[in-house]
Amino acid sequence: MTMSDPIADFLTRIRNANMVRHETVETPASKIKINIAQILKDEGFITDYQVVDTPNKQGLISLSLKYGPNRERIITGLKRISKPGLRSYVQADSVPKVLNGLGIAILSTSEGVMTDKAARAKMIGGEVIAYVW
């Protein structure tokens, strides 16, 4: 059976692993998931990620989650915004800020997947994929 929203599944796997303080989490790979993982790494929400080849064509992404010195969570929240049944698009002048700039919004734009800060700097809008804080 096919999955109706693979990005929501990706975010849910990260959220669940983070809640029980797992060191790593594996999820099926895709280009957009790799781009989201790169953004999470660049913004300091995860330590690293690796794309693991498997016998099937798809492969896996292995994410190394990041925690504070006393095992406190770095990712306190993940929320899927644009869903298959209700897409959410924003124009360049209305790109959202998450928690007044403490979190990030991940957008899919005509120039690729990027954070809200990068989209504001380039003055482009797009589809709001998720909020991370």
Swiss-Prot record:
GO molecular function, one term: rRNA binding
PROSITE patterns the record matches: RIBOSOMAL_S8 (PS00053)
A cellular component term, taken from the record's GO annotations: ribosome
The keyword GTP-binding is annotated on this UniProt entry: no
GO biological process, one term: translation
InterPro entries reported in the protein's UniProt record: Ribosomal_uS8, Ribosomal_uS8_CS, Ribosomal_uS8_sf
Keywords from the UniProt entry: Ribonucleoprotein, Ribosomal protein, RNA-binding, rRNA-binding
The protein's role, per its UniProt record: One of the primary rRNA binding proteins, it binds directly to 16S rRNA central domain where it helps coordinate assembly of the platform of the 30S subunit.
Family: Belongs to the universal ribosomal protein uS8 family.
Assembly with partners or alone: Part of the 30S ribosomal subunit. Contacts proteins S5 and S12.
Protein name per Swiss-Prot or TrEMBL: Small ribosomal subunit protein uS8
Protein's organism: Oenococcus oeni (strain ATCC BAA-331 / PSU-1)
Gene for this chain: rpsH
